[in-house]
Amino acid sequence: MEVILLDKVGKLGAIGDKVTVKSGYGRNYLLPQGKAVAATEKNIADFEARRAELEATAAAKISEATARAEKLASLEVTIAANAGTEGRLFGSIGTRDIAEAITAAGVAVAKSEVRLPQGVLREVGQFEIDIQLHAEVVQVVKLVVVAE
């Protein structure tokens, strides 16, 4: 299935790229999310007419994400959790807990923007968490997990 990208998609392309994707990926993700349109003659002409508008919208999203990243740069978040004597948590701290703590600290972050490549946090200590605000904007936030 050939599609025209309306937004930057990681590992696929940028705005205006005409790419070939598997049909299921196109129908179930790219098209419903508004990230692409099918590459028909009409859609190609419509895209070329709206290209400047879409690029301006993308630039606005990047500048908004950069502004949020600047707010997050100086932020240090502390989360208190029940822990045993050796520093192991009873339970874990996941993306939702981190997003709620950052939002409570004053910067709105969705749980889908929090990246934990090693999985959930299960011990007390200091961690550096990646917050991906946009495909091009990633900010590191210092997180301190303390025992209650």
Swiss-Prot record:
Gene Ontology cellular component list: ribonucleoprotein complex; ribosome
Disulfide cross-links: none
SUPFAM superfamilies cross-referenced by the UniProt entry: L9 N-domain-like, Ribosomal protein L9 C-domain
KW RNA-binding (keyword) present: yes
Molecular function GO labels: rRNA binding; structural constituent of ribosome
A Pfam family it matches: Ribosomal_L9_N
InterPro entries associated with the record: Ribosomal_bL9, Ribosomal_bL9/RNase_H1_N, Ribosomal_bL9_bac/chp, Ribosomal_bL9_C, Ribosomal_bL9_C_sf, Ribosomal_bL9_N, Ribosomal_bL9_N_sf
Alphabetical UniProt keywords: Ribonucleoprotein, Ribosomal protein, RNA-binding, rRNA-binding
Presence of keyword Ribosomal protein: yes
GO biological process, alphabetically ordered: translation
Role, per record: Binds to the 23S rRNA.
Family, as annotated: Belongs to the bacterial ribosomal protein bL9 family.
NCBIfam families: L9
Protein name according to UniProt: Large ribosomal subunit protein bL9
Species name: Cellvibrio japonicus (strain Ueda107) (Pseudomonas fluorescens subsp. cellulosa)
